[in-house]
C-alpha cells in the first residue's frame, strides 16, 4: 500500500510554509500526478488514463478498524467540534453538519472533472452493518499525539483511505480546521486529491493557488485550476461522466438553434480561480480523447464556429512558466447527421491557437455534429462558440432583369423608393424595402454584367454604360437635394 503522509498540513500556516521547503521540494510541481484509479467497485477494472470513475466514499463508525487505524474515533471528534446535540448523535451520519460539509467537498470533483463521488453508509440508522464500504474510507485517530502535528494523511489509488488526526488542543477543544467549514472542507478535498492520485503543487510568487499546495489553504473554495487540470488529465472533463461523449452516438447535445441563436461553452477554464459551483469545463485530455457535440438547426442558416484553447499562465518552482492555454494543437470537424458526411473542418493553426470557420452554410434544417480532438498527448481546456445567422440574400441591382446594372435600373429604384418591396421595384438587398441601402448596392454594381448561368466566370464592366456614370450620379445627388 503506497502511503503519503501530509507532514505539510500543520495547524500553524507559517510553520507549514517552512516545512514545505524542508519536506516538499522534491515532489511539488504544477499538476503533480502520482497515479490514478484503475479499478473501482462500480466501474470494474482495466481503467485507463482519461477514463471517468465513480468512487464510493464512506465514514468508518467509531470503534471499528480499517486500513489506517485499529480503532477509529473520528465521529465523536467531529461531533464535539461541531457541537452536535446528544439527541442527534445517531448511527446515521448524513444528518450531521460536518457530513454536509464533506458531501459538498466531494460534489466539487464531479463538477470539474470525470470523477464522481457517491456516499455509501457503512451502517444504517439502527447501527447495523450495511455490508458496504467505500472505495475511499474516512476515519481518524491520534496520529502523533501533539496538537501541532499533522492534520491528516491519505493513501494513493487503488486505496485512497483517509486518516484525520483526532488529537485535541491543549485545552481539550477541537481545532478550528476540523470544526469550521473552510478548514474541514479543504482538508477533505486536499486529502482526497491524494486519494485520486494527485501530489503537491508549489508556485512562484503566489502566481496561482491550489488546494493541493502543501499548506492547508482556507482562502479558496476547494479545487483550483491547477488541481482541476491534473484531474482532467487523469479522468477527463465532466462530459466524460455517465458514458462520456467520445462518439457521435453519445454526443453532448448543445440544443436547437434558430438563425439568431448562439452558445458559448467551456468558459470556466479561462482563469486560475475556481468558484464552488463552476461546472463549465471542456477539455481534450490527450491523443486518445475526442469530444462529440450535437446540435439542431431549425432552418437553413450560416454559422460562425470557433474553438479556442483556454487557460491561465502561472509559474511553478519545478517547471517554470506554465501556459495552460498552449498545451495542445486542437482541431475540429463538422458532420451532417445521420450520415456523418463531412461538412467542413478547421486544422490550420498550431498549439495554443484558435481554429474557426466563418459563414459555414447549413443548407438544410436538421442535426449536425462537431468533433474536437488534439494532436499532442496533453490536456487542453477549450472554449467552443457557435453563432447562427440568416442565409445572406444575394444583392442584385439588376431590377429590370436585362442582365446588366445601368441607368434604367436606377430609374426603377427612383420610382420605387419609399414604396416598393420587391426586386422589380428596386429592392436590391432583399429586405422588402426600397431605400437608400438599395441605392448603395446599385452604385456598387453599376456597370456590371449579370451572368446567372455561369457565376464562376465573374462579372466584367460594361464599357458602354460607364459613360453614363457621371451624369447619373449627378442625378442621384440632385434627387437627394430635392428630398432634403
Per-segment meaning from a language model:
Residues 100-108, 181, 185-186, 195, ...:
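Alpha-helical segments with a strong preference for the paired helices of cellulosomal dockerin domains
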Residues 26-304, 316-319, 330-335, 342, ...:
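Zinc-dependent metalloendopeptidases
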Residues 476-484:
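C-terminal membrane-anchoring or membrane-association module
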Residues 353-362:
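Beta-sandwich interaction modules
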Amino acid at each position: 500500500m503506497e502511503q503519503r503522509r501530509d507532514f505539510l498540513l500543520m495547524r500553524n500556516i507559517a510553520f507549514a510554509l517552512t516545512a514545505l521547503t524542508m519536506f516538499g521540494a522534491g515532489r511539488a510541481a504544477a499538476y503533480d500526478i502520482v497515479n490514478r484509479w484503475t479499478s473501482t467497485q462500480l466501474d470494474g477494472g482495466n481503467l485507463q488514463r482519461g477514463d471517468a470513475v465513480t468512487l464510493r466514499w464512506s465514514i468508518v463508525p467509531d470503534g471499528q478498524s480499517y486500513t489506517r487505524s485499529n480503532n477509529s474515533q473520528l465521529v465523536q471528534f467531529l461531533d464535539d467540534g461541531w457541537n452536535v446535540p446528544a439527541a442527534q448523535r445517531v448511527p446515521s451520519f448524513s444528518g450531521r453538519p460536518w457530513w454536509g460539509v464533506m458531501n459538498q467537498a466531494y460534489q466539487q470533483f464531479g463538477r470539474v472533472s470525470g470523477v464522481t463521488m457517491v456516499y455509501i453508509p457503512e451502517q444504517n440508522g439502527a447501527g447495523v452493518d450495511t455490508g458496504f464500504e467505500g472505495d475511499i474510507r474516512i476515519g481518524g485517530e491520534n496520529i502523533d499525539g501533539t496538537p501541532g502535528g499533522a492534520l491528516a494523511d491519505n493513501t494513493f489509488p487503488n486505496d485512497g483511505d483517509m486518516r484525520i488526526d483526532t488529537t485535541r488542543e491543549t485545552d481539550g477543544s477541537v481545532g478550528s480546521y476540523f470544526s469550521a467549514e473552510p478548514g474541514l472542507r479543504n482538508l477533505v478535498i486536499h486529502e482526497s486529491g491524494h486519494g485520486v492520485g494527485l501530489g503537491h503543487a508549489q508556485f512562484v510568487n503566489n502566481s496561482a493557488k491550489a488546494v493541493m499546495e502543501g499548506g492547508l489553504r482556507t482562502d479558496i473554495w476547494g479545487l483550483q485550476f491547477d488541481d482541476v487540470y491534473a484531474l482532467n488529465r487523469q479522468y477527463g472533463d465532466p462530459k466524460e461522466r455517465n458514458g462520456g461523449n467520445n462518439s457521435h452516438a453519445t454526443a453532448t447535445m448543445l440544443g436547437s438553434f434558430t438563425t439568431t441563436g448562439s452558445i458559448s461553452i467551456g468558459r470556466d477554464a479561462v482563469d486560475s480561480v475556481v468558484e464552488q459551483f463552476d461546472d463549465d469545463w471542456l477539455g481534450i485530455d490527450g491523443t486518445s480523447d475526442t469530444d462529440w457535440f450535437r446540435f439542431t438547426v431549425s432552418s437553413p442558416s450560416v454559422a460562425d464556429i470557433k474553438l479556442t484553447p483556454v487557460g491561465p499562465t502561472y509559474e511553478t518552482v519545478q517547471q517554470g512558466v506554465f501556459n495552460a492555454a498552449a498545451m495542445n494543437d486542437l482541431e475540429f470537424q463538422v458532420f451532417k447527421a445521420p450520415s456523418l458526411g463531412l461538412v467542413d473542418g478547421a486544422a490550420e493553426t498550431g498549439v495554443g491557437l484558435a481554429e474557426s470557420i466563418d459563414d459555414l452554410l447549413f443548407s438544410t434544417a436538421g442535426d449536425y455534429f462537431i468533433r474536437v480532438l488534439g494532436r499532442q498527448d496533453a490536456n487542453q481546456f477549450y472554449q467552443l462558440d457557435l453563432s447562427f445567422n440568416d442565409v445572406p440574400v444575394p444583392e442584385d441591382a439588376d431590377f429590370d432583369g436585362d442582365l446588366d446594372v445601368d441607368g434604367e435600373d436606377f430609374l426603377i429604384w427612383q420610382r420605387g423608393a419609399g414604396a416598393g418591396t420587391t426586386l422589380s421595384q428596386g429592392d436590391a438587398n432583399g429586405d422588402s424595402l426600397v431605400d437608400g441601402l438599395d441605392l448603395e448596392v446599385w452604385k456598387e454594381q453599376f456597370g456590371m454584367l449579370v451572368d446567372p448561368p455561369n457565376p464562376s466566370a465573374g462579372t466584367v464592366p460594361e464599357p458602354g454604360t460607364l459613360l453614363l456614370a457621371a451624369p447619373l450620379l449627378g442625378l442621384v445627388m440632385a434627387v437627394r437635394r430635392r428630398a432634403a
